[in-house]
């Protein structure tokens, strides 16, 4: 029987000093002996997805205390990728994932906490917390802040029809010379109307949905709107459940509740299957690889490639389809409705554990909104947007009169009526990306699934943006942005502005973009990222010349630099001859702090999840 970790600092004569300090935090004499639950919050006033989390930690803490445990809250950092986008701030986004994981490890281990509640929401926070959960392997539950409501705009002078929109619309229209300042202002003011993570299937919502599929969060975690009063129950239930599973582990020796027992290879395959079926952010590939690495699970790019060939796309939301947003996914039954359709098609491992059900199969049946006996599920998924601008959680209680049960033409479809039988994400291989690169096929127009074009080479995102806005890019070009990988950036910037500006210039279906950097979950179009190995690690993307021909074939999962093997070898030899200047960008003026240089020195390429090269530490 495992012993409560917290006894290290709460029991024994020699811990009198530690107990004195515990008492000073509010621990009473009768509390000693109870499990100590760490509540890792990520509240910040910088991020709309986190601005409403201020009281969430204490909400969970009070419920933990009612259930018979001690709750202690602390905070992690949280970076808003949208605000950090398009300038040097984006260099810090991916590295913050490691800082978040480390900070949770430090706090939990330093204070000998027995279990963990992770209150997350946005892009790097959820994966950072997942990495920490796998590293610590103590009872853990995730509960996120929830998605924001979709924006809505009537149109200039009420002439245009009403349409829903999101952050990406503001970015695209701001760079379109055909859009007036008044129109841009209207979109800007209405794109993000409430607190919560951005309203489409971007990285934040993708990751929160994946925690459901992994089995580490409650049903509705990824789709229940931040503003809805019903979401409060997720936080309260998380507080009760963490105490239950903590006691099951420490008092009943039930190891099935531990993160590594839940997040097995089968669970990672389930999560990736769900992500492919939804056409989620390509960032999820990066993060799942990193989380699996921390969990000691052999889950690689080859597994993702295998799944991408057999999983259909059965749910397509913004930015890939502006008919649907996360609020529509929720109305259609949320993640468990998607999992049900995938299970019916034999695409899931349903014998895996979850924190809230003995098996995933049990959970799918319990949360099936098509079963009239599941009244709790039906009530939960009727939660609707309130349509009122607010930064307050639980501020409205509007409910849909009906659910979206249309599995032929609705938001979530059965496999027979899938948007495409080929999934929403794909891994491409070729001489320009020997260890793979990724593309969100759900966002690629069918007319350009095969594309051959002229390489236009840029050695920084800034130069690429300047080239696009300066009308240097024309139809048929393939924009190559290199030295933006985890090591080369350093920090692996997102390329949302270049892809958005290509759309602004009317080139969204006429050009492609290839990078060793990554993309925002809001990206769509023929945008191929994570080219591995990256240029700074000796990848062939660093050997592309201006004007080269690049051939992209998504159906056959290939990407090819159209030069001979001999020419490629000659270019590599020429690069190596540059000595200390080899595999570094030419003429790039970028300040890189010591903190970022330290990150880059230990970072691996994207095919490994951009995790630290631990071998360097152990030398």
From Swiss-Prot:
Pathway: Amino-acid biosynthesis; L-isoleucine biosynthesis; L-isoleucine from 2-oxobutanoate: step 3/4; Amino-acid biosynthesis; L-valine biosynthesis; L-valine from pyruvate: step 3/4. Mg(2+) binds at residues 81, 123-124, 494. The gene is ilvD. The keyword Magnesium applies. This is Dihydroxy-acid dehydratase. GO terms for molecular function: 2 iron, 2 sulfur cluster binding; dihydroxy-acid dehydratase activity; magnesium ion binding. It comes from Neisseria meningitidis serogroup C / serotype 2a (strain ATCC 700532 / DSM 15464 / FAM18). Belongs to the IlvD/Edd family. InterPro entries: Dihydro-acid_dehy_C, DihydroxyA_deHydtase, DiOHA_6PGluconate_deHydtase_CS, ILV_EDD_C, ILV_EDD_N, IlvD/EDD_N. Its EC number is 4.2.1.9.
């Amino acid at each position: 029987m495992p012993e409560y970790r917290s006894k290290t600092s709460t029991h024994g004569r020699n811990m009198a000093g530690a107990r004195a300090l515990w008492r000073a935090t509010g621990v009473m004499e009768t509390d000693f002996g109870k499990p100590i639950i760490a509540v890792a919050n990520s509240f910040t006033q910088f991020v709309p997805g986190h601005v409403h989390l201020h009281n969430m930690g204490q909400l969970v803490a009070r419920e933990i205390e009612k259930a018979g445990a001690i709750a202690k809250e602390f905070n992690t950092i949280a970076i808003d990728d949208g605000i950090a986008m398009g300038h040097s701030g984006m260099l810090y986004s991916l590295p913050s994932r490691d800082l978040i994981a480390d900070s949770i490890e430090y706090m939990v281990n330093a204070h000998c906490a027995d279990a963990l509640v992770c209150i997350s929401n946005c892009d790097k926070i959820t994966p950072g917390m997942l990495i920490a959960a796998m590293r610590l392997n103590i009872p853990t539950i995730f509960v996120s802040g929830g998605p924001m409501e979709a924006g809505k705009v009537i149109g200039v002078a009420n002439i245009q029809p009403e349409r829903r929109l999101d952050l990406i619309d503001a970015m695209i229209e701001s760079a379109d010379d055909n859009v007036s300042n008044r129109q841009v202002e209207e979109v800007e003011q209405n794109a993000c109307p409430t607190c919560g993570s951005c309203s489409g299937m971007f990285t934040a919502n993708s990751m929160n949905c994946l925690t459901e599929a992994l089995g580490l969060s409650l049903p509705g975690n990824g789709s229940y709107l931040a503003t809805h009063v019903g979401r409060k129950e997720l936080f309260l239930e998380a507080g009760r459940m963490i105490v239950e599973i903590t006691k099951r582990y420490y008092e009943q020796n039930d190891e099935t509740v531990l993160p590594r027992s839940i997040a097995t290879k089968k669970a990672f395959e389930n999560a990736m299957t769900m992500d492919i079926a939804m056409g989620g952010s390509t960032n999820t590939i990066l993060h799942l690889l990193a989380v699996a690495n921390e969990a000691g699970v052999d889950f690689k790019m080859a597994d993702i490639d295998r799944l991408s060939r057999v999983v259909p796309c059965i749910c397509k939301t913004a930015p890939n389809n502006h008919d649907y947003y996360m609020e529509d996914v929720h109305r259609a039954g949320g993640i468990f409705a998607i999992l049900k359709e995938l299970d019916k098609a034999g695409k899931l491992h349903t014998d895996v554990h979850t924190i809230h059900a003995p098996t995933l199969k049990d959970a799918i049946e319990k949360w099936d909104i098509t079963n009239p006996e599941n009244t709790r599920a039906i009530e939960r998924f009727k939660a609707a947007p309130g349509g009122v601008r607010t930064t307050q959680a639980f501020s409205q209680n509007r409910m849909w009169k009906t659910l979206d049960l249309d599995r032929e033409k609705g938001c979530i479809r059965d496999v027979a009526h899938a948007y495409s039988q080929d999934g929403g994400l794909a891994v491409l291989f070729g001489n320009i990306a020997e260890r793979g690169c990724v593309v969100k096929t759900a966002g690629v127009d069918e007319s350009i699934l095969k594309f051959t074009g002229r390489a236009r080479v840029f050695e920084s995102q800034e130069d690429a943006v300047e080239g696009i806005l300066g009308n240097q890019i024309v139809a048929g070009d393939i924009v190559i942005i290199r030295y933006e990988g985890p090591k080369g950036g350093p920090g692996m910037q997102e390329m949302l502005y270049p892809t958005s500006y290509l759309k602004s210039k009317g080139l969204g279906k006429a050009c492609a973009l290839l990078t060793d950097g990554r993309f925002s979950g809001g990206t769509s179009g023929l945008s191929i990222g994570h080219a591995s190995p990256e240029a700074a690690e000796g990848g062939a993307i660093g050997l592309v010349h201006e004007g080269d021909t690049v051939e992209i074939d998504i159906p056959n999962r290939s990407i090819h630099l159209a030069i001979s093997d001999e020419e490629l070898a000659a270019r590599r030899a020429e690069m190596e001859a540059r000595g200390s200047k080899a595999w570094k960008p030419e003429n790039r003026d970028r300040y890189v702090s010591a903190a970022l240089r330290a990150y880059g020195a230990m970072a691996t390429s994207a095919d490994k999840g951009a995790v630290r090269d631990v071998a360097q530490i152990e030398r």
